[in-house]
Amino acid sequence: MPRTARSTVAQVCYHVINRGNHRARVFDSPGDFRAFLDLVSMAQARVRLDLLAACLMPNHFHLVVVPHAPGDLGHWMHWLLTTHVCRYNRCRATTGRVWQGRFKAFPIERDEHLLTVMRYVERNALRAGLVDDSQDWAWGSLAWRNGSVHRYLLTEPPIELPRDWTDLVNSPQTSCELKALRTCVNRQRPFGNDAWVVRTAVDLGLQSSLRRVGRPPKEPRS
């Protein structure tokens, strides 16, 4: 069965994630991380797309992006991942998959929900126990905001970050927030206020992401 085309639109914020094939480690050294970020910069030069937040982890990555034209997210990601796979395999004299498949993405409402997703992304290394403070992870956008050489990759978000943003990122998120975000990641469900979620799901053909998982309950016998 052919894959259905992604329905992504312009000027909508998206969370994007992909993992190494079989969840294997992809980035083994600082050079691996830097090479991927160089490709992100090259992809931005080819297809206009704003990067609001990011976190590269050893076996996966998170991005928060805003495409400028319909379909641009798919074009941008296709170039980024296929180019990375070619260079990765050539460097290691290997063949085969590097990433587990197509990336996952879900749309985000441009309000406090966007800040919630950005916090989730920027504290990823802290949540995984790789650093004591999120800004110490060199491959995440919180470090870049605080003066890293990779600051140039970022675009200012459409809503202003609070002055205590670093402290907010380093503060734990609630279990409800994490559960909602992980559901959106797994089901590619829009993340926002209820009315916006329903409207966006209809507009983008994502109604199935709103349905409950599992079999519908049996109707009582008459």
Regions found by a protein language model. Name each.
Residues 1-58, 66-222:
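Short Pro-Cys-Gly-centered "Cys-loop" motif that presents a nucleophilic cysteine in a tight turn
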Residues 63:
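Conserved metal-phosphate-binding beta-hairpin within the catalytic cores
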